[in-house]
Amino acid sequence: EAQWLIRTVENLLSITRIGSDRTELNKQLEPVEEVLAEAVQKARKRLPEIKFSVEVPAELLMVPMDPILIEQVLSNLIENAVIHGKTTTAIHLRAEKTEDNFAAFSVRDNGQGISPALLPHLFDYSIRHASPPTGDGKRNMGLGLSVCSAVVKAHGGRLTAHNHPDGAEFIFCLPMPPADPAISTDLSEEETL
């Protein structure tokens, strides 16, 4: 009960912060492996019955982000997979660099998937309403995915969701800094010496 209340307050504070005109993200270059590991570590404590797996690139992937907010996005997506996936027993998190210079984060579950009728409006809080209480008596405020969308957009990224044969997958992409040709040239010259 206390953890649910804390997460609800965190979501409300984040959406208020992101919605204000003077929002400044605390962006810094962060290794995606550490952000994913932190989110999974916290999720394992709350959801010991779920099997988690993580896949990251072999090379270090540094992404400009507000790590606290991105960890909240990951936590919300994990919790969403468990609550709405209903039959979810495993969640796979993955990060990779895309060809168009984005860092793509994926949260994939083996639950029941997303109703096709909900997919077009999944991130729109004005369309979604609080759901009836779940089996444990808690209400879903409908904030989690709206917060995810707002945080990712504030980072200049995009968030999508789709079903796959064994459940649902949420993918969000954050822009990477442009590669500095001088740095890569210097490194290649040092390697040849």
Language model features: what each stretch is:
Residues E1-L5:
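Short alpha-helical segment of the dimerization/phosphotransfer core of two-component systems
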Residues S20-L25, M62-M65:
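Conserved micro-motifs of the catalytic ATP-binding
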Residues N26-L29, K51-L61:
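Conserved catalytic submotifs in the C-terminal HATPase_c
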Residues A81-V82:
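Short helix-loop "hinge" at the ATP-lid/N-box region of the Bergerat-fold HATPase_c
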Residues I114-S126:
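Short conserved segment of the HATPase_c
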Residues G144, C148:
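Short alpha-helical Gxxx[C/S/T] motif in the catalytic ATP-binding
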